Curated annotation (Swiss-Prot):
It is found in: Cell membrane; Basolateral cell membrane. Residues 122-130, 177-186, 250-252, 323-328, 372-373, 439-444, 506-816 are cytoplasmic. PANTHER family: SODIUM/HYDROGEN EXCHANGER, SODIUM_HYDROGEN EXCHANGER 1. The record marks F161 as: Channel pore-lining. GO terms for molecular function: calcium-dependent protein binding; calmodulin binding; identical protein binding; phospholipid binding; potassium:proton antiporter activity; protein phosphatase 2B binding; sodium:proton antiporter activity. This is Sodium/hydrogen exchanger 1. It comes from Oryctolagus cuniculus (Rabbit). Residues 37-50, 783-792 have a biased composition (Polar residues). Glycans are attached at N75. Residues 503-545, 633-816 are annotated as: Interaction with TESC. Residues 37-79, 748-816 are annotated as: Disordered.
Length: 816
C-alpha cells in the first residue's frame, strides 16, 4: 500500500524514470550471481536421462510408455558405427556466462544514467542534497538489496578505479582548465597542495600515534610508520568530490580554482608519501639516506609526470597537423594520447594525474587550431559524458563497497581521526594564508579562508589507497578503511550539504553567470600589456614579463611546427570571421531567411516563372557562449602588442619611421595623405579630380618626382617646404595677378576675378630665398582679421612634411 500511494503521488513524467530504475535493479540481480543463470530443475538432468516426450498419433495425444533398458529399441546403425544418438536442433539457447561481464557493466552504466535523470526530475531534492550524496545513498540501497538476497555485492577494485574511472575525470578537468586563473594563482595553489598536504599528513599521523599509545589494547600495536601512512592517505583533498560539490554551489572563480587546483596538484605528494611509508614499514631501520632519497623522489614523481604529459601533448598536437583529409579520427587522437600519457606515468610510478593535466593543457590550443569544428564539439561532449558517468559510478560503488567490505570499528580511533582531520585542515589553511597574504595583491579574506578550509573534501582516492593496503604488512587495514569511509561520508554528507547555506549566509561572492563583454576583454588585454611595459621599465621580471616571453616564443617557433599550413601565420581573427559568415549563411538558409531554390529540374524552373519568395524578415542568430568564447580567445591571442606600436608621436610627422612595421607605415601614410588632400581642398580651393588622379601613397618632399603630370587647365602651385610660414617666400610669376592675390584679404571677389581672367596661365608660386626674420616678425599677427585672411594664413603656415636632411635652410638661423 505504501508503494502504491508513493506511485500515485508522482506525476506521469516522474513515473517513467522510477520504473526504469526498478527495471535496471531487477536486471542487476540475476547478473550478480556467482554461478551464472540457474535453470529449472527439469532442465538440470543427467546426460544419460532422456526428457519425457509426447507422441502424437492422429488426433490423439498419448504419453509414451515407460521404457526400460531391456525393452528400449536399439539403433543398430548407431551401435555399429559407434556414433552418439542425434539430438534435436536447439531453437533457443541461454548462455549467460558468455555475455556476463559486458552485460553487467552496461547495467551499471544504465543505472548511473537513470539516477542522474531521476535527480533532476525532482528539483526539490537536488536543490537541498548534493548529487554525490544521493548517489552514495543509492549505492548503499543497491548493496543492501544485493546482500539481502544472499549474494555478495561487488567491490570497487583499486585497479578499476585508477585505470578506468579516474582518468576521464582528470582529463576533462585538465583539457578545459581555466588556464589564466590557474597560472595567476599557481604559487598559492602549490603552497596549499604541497606544504598543506605535508602538514596534514604529519600532524594527523603524529596525533594518531599518540592516540594509539593511550587508546587501549586494540590499537596499541599500531606503530608510527603505520599512522604516518594512514595520515598520508586521509590528508589529500579529492578532486572528484570537490568537482561534484563546488560546481553545484557556483562559487567564485578564485575559490574554485584554489580548492580544485590543490586537489589536482596534491596527487604527487600523496603518491610519494604513500609509497615512501609503505616501503619504510618493511624496513628494520630507516636511515638519513632513505629520508633524503624519499625527499628527492617527490621532485622525480611530480616533474616526471609533467614531462611525460608534455611529451604526449606535443606528439598529439603534431599528429593533428596531418588529419585534414581524415576528420573522423581527430577526436580519437586526443583520447588515446592522453590515456597513453596516464598509463606511461603509472608505468614508472610517476604522477598520472600530473601527466593528464599537462597533456591536456599543452595539446588543446594546437589541436583546436588543426581540427574541424565538428571534431571539437565531439571532444567536448564526449569528455563531459565520460567524466560524468565515471563520477556517478564512483559514488555509487562507494556506497556498494561500504556494504560489501569488511569493517573493524573502534570508537576512539574513528572519532579521533575525524576530529583531527578537521583541526589539521583549519590550522593549515589559517597558517598558510597568513603567509600567502604577505605576497598577494588580492588578499584572501576570512570568508575565503573559511570556504577553503570547509571545502577540503575526501573521496574515492583515499578509499582506493586504503583498499590497496596488504593485510600481511598492515594487520589493521580494516580499521584504517573503516575510518577512511567515516571521514568520506562526513565530508561529503555534512560538509557537502551545509556548504551551500553557509555560502549564502556569509554572502560569499559567487560565479558570474554572464560572460564578460568584448570591451572588458580588450581592456584586460590592454592592462596586461601595460603591466608588462611597467615591469620592463622598473626592471622587475614578474609573471607578466615571463608570460610575454612565452607568447613570443610560442608564436615564433612552436606554432610553426605544431599548426598546419597558413594557420600558424595568418591572424586567427580572419579565419574565425569566415567561419562565422559560413555559420550565419547556413543558419539563414535553415531558418528560411533566403528564398527557396527548386530541388528538382522542372519546366516551371526552366521558364523562369517561379514565384518570388516574400521578403522574409532576417533572423539574426543569437551569439552563443561557445562563439563568444572563441571571439575572446582570438582577441587575447591577436590584439596588437604595446611594444609593436609607434615609439614616438609628433603631430608634424607625415611619413612614418622607415624602421617601423610595414603596416604601421601604410596606415600613417594613408591617414596623412587624406589630411593633406583635405587641407588643399579647403584652403587653396584646388579642384580635386579623384577619378583622374591616382591615390597618393605619401606626401611629396623636396625633389621627389611628381606623382602625376598636372593638366594644362589647372594652376600649378609650388610651395617651399623650407619656410612655408613666410608670405614673402612666395613669388608669383604672373606679375599682373600678384597684386590681386596679395589683396585677397581685402577683396576676395577681386581675387576670384583675377583667377578667372588668367585661367590658361595658372598661378605659379616659386620659393624665394628665406630671409632671417626676427622673433617678432615670426609670431606677429596678420594685419587683417577677416576670415579669408585667416584662412590664407592657416594655409601658408601649414608646416607640411619635414624636409630631408640638407634640403633648405633652417627657419630661424642659429645666430638668433
Amino acid at each position: 500500500m505504501l508503494l502504491w500511494s508513493a506511485v500515485r503521488g508522482l506525476s506521469p513524467p516522474r513515473i517513467v524514470p522510477s520504473l526504469l530504475v526498478v527495471v535496471a535493479l531487477a536486471g542487476l540481480l540475476p547478473g550478480l550471481r556467482s554461478h551464472g543463470l540457474q535453470l529449472s530443475p527439469t532442465d538440470s538432468t543427467t546426460p544419460d536421462s532422456q526428457p519425457s516426450r509426447e507422441r502424437s498419433i492422429g488426433d490423439v495425444t498419448t504419453a509414451p510408455p515407460e521404457v526400460t533398458p531391456e525393452s528400449r529399441p536399439v539403433n543398430r546403425s548407431v551401435t555399429e558405427h559407434g556414433m552418439k544418438p542425434r539430438k534435436a536442433f536447439p531453437v533457443l539457447g541461454i548462455d549467460y556466462t558468455h555475455v556476463r561481464t559486458p552485460f553487467e557493466i552496461s547495467l551499471w552504466i544504465l543505472l548511473a544514467c537513470l539516477m542522474k535523470i531521476g535527480f533532476h526530475v525532482i528539483p526539490t531534492i537536488s536543490s537541498i542534497v548534493p548529487e554525490s550524496c544521493l548517489l552514495i545513498v543509492v549505492g548503499l540501497l543497491v548493496g543492501g538489496l544485493i546482500k539481502g538476497v544472499g549474494e555478495k555485492p561487488p567491490f570497487l577494485q583499486s585497479e578499476v578505479f585508477f585505470l578506468f574511472l579516474l582518468p576521464p575525470i582528470i582529463l576533462d578537468a585538465g583539457y578545459f582548465l581555466p588556464l589564466r586563473q590557474f597560472t595567476e594563482n599557481l604559487g598559492t595553489i602549490l603552497i596549499f597542495a604541497v606544504v598543506g598536504t605535508l602538514w596534514n599528513a604529519f600532524f594527523l599521523g603524529g596525533l594518531m600515534y599518540a592516540v594509539c599509545l593511550v587508546g587501549g589494547e586494540q590499537i596499541n600495536n599500531i606503530g608510527l610508520l603505520d599512522n604516518l601512512l594512514f595520515g598520508s592517505i586521509i590528508s589529500a583533498v579529492d578532486p572528484v568530490a570537490v568537482l561534484a560539490v563546488f560546481e553545484e554551489i557556483h562559487i567564485n572563480e578564485l575559490l574554485h580554482i584554489l580548492v580544485f587546483g590543490e586537489s589536482l596538484l596534491n596527487d604527487a605528494v600523496t603518491v610519494v608519501l604513500y609509497h615512501l611509508f609503505e616501503e619504510f614499514a618493511n624496513y628494520d631501520h630507516v636511515g638519513i639516506v632513505d629520508i633524503v632519497l624519499g625527499f628527492l623522489s617527490f621532485f622525480v614523481v611530480a616533474l616526471g609526470g609533467v614531462f611525460v604529459g608534455v611529451v604526449y601533448g606535443v606528439i598529439a598536437a603534431f599528429t593533428s597537423r596531418f588529419t585534414a583529409h581524415i576528420r573522423v579520427i581527430e577526436p580519437l587522437f586526443v583520447f588515446l594520447y592522453s590515456y597513453m600519457a596516464y598509463l606511461s606515468a603509472e608505468l614508472f610510478h610517476l604522477s598520472g594525474i600530473m601527466a593528464l593535466i599537462a597533456s591536456g593543457v599543452v595539446m588543446r590550443p594546437y589541436v583546436e587550431a588543426n581540427i574541424s569544428h565538428k571534431s571539437h564539439t565531439t571532444i567536448k561532449y564526449f569528455l563531459k559524458m565520460w567524466s560524468s558517468v565515471s563520477e556517478t559510478l564512483i559514488f555509487i560503488f562507494l556506497g556498494v563497497s561500504t556494504v560489501a567490505g569488511s569493517h573493524h570499528w573502534n570508537w576512539t580511533f574513528v572519532i579521533s581521526t575525524l576530529l583531527f582531520c578537521l583541526i589539521a585542515r583549519v590550522l593549515g589553511v589559517l597558517g598558510l594564508t597568513w603567509f600567502i597574504n604577505k605576497f598577494r595583491i588580492v588578499k584572501l579574506t576570512p570568508k575565503d579562508q573559511f570556504i577553503i578550509a570547509y571545502g577540503g573534501l575526501r573521496g574515492a582516492i583515499a578509499f582506493s589507497l586504503g583498499y590497496l593496503l596488504d593485510k600481511k604488512h598492515f594487520p589493521m587495514c580494516d580499521l584504517f578503511l573503516t575510518a577512511i569511509i567515516t571521514v568520506i561520508f562526513f565530508t561529503v554528507f555534512v560538509q557537502g550539504m551545509t556548504i551551500r547555506p553557509l555560502v549564502d549566509l556569509l554572502a560569499v561572492k559567487k560565479k558570474q553567470e554572464t560572460k564578460r563583454s568584448i570591451n572588458e576583454e580588450i581592456h584586460t588585454q590592454f592592462l596586461d600589456h601595460l603591466l608588462t611595459g611597467i615591469e620592463d621599465i622598473c626592471g622587475h621580471y614578474g609573471h607578466h614579463h615571463w608570460k610575454d616571453k612565452l607568447n613570443r616564443f610560442n608564436k615564433k617557433y612552436v606554432k610553426k611546427c605544431l599548426i598546419a599550413g597558413e594557420r600558424s601565420k595568418e591572424p586567427q581573427l580572419i579565419a574565425f570571421y569566415h567561419k562565422m559568415e559560413m555559420k550565419q549563411a547556413i543558419e539563414l538558409v535553415e531558418s528560411g531567411g533566403m528564398g527557396k531554390i527548386p530541388s528538382a529540374v522542372s519546366t516551371v524552373s526552366m521558364q523562369n516563372i517561379h514565384p518570388k519568395a516574400l521578403p522574409a524578415e532576417r533572423i539574426l542568430p543569437a551569439l552563443s557562449k561557445d562563439k563568444e568564447e572563441e571571439i575572446r580567445k582570438i582577441l587575447r591571442n591577436n590584439l596588437q602588442k604595446t611594444r609593436q606600436r609607434l615609439r614616438s608621436y609628433n603631430r608634424h610627422t607625415l611619413v612614418a619611421d622607415p624602421y617601423e612595421e610595414a603596416w604601421n607605415q601604410m596606415l600613417l601614410r594613408r591617414q596623412k595623405a587624406r589630411q593633406l588632400e583635405q587641407k588643399i581642398n579647403n584652403y587653396l580651393t584646388v579642384p580635386a579630380h579623384k577619378l583622374d588622379s591616382p591615390t597618393m601613397s605619401r606626401a611629396r618632399i623636396g625633389s621627389d618626382p611628381l606623382a602625376y603630370e598636372p593638366k594644362a587647365d589647372l594652376p600649378v602651385i609650388t610651395i617651399d617646404p623650407a619656410s612655408p610660414q613666410s608670405p614673402e617666400s612666395v613669388d608669383l610669376v604672373n606679375e599682373e595677378l600678384k597684386g590681386k592675390v596679395l589683396g585677397l584679404s581685402r577683396e576676395p571677389r577681386v581675387a576670384e576675378e583675377a583667377a578667372e581672367e588668367d585661367e590658361d596661365g595658372g598661378i605659379v608660386m616659386r620659393p624665394k630665398e628665406p630671409s632671417s626674420p626676427g622673433t617678432d616678425d615670426v609670431f606677429s599677427p596678420a594685419p587683417s582679421d577677416s576670415p579669408s585672411s585667416q584662412r590664407m594664413q592657416r594655409c601658408l603656415s601649414d608646416p607640411g612634411p619635414h624636409p630631408e636632411p640638407g634640403e633648405g635652410e633652417p627657419f630661424i638661423p642659429k645666430g638668433q
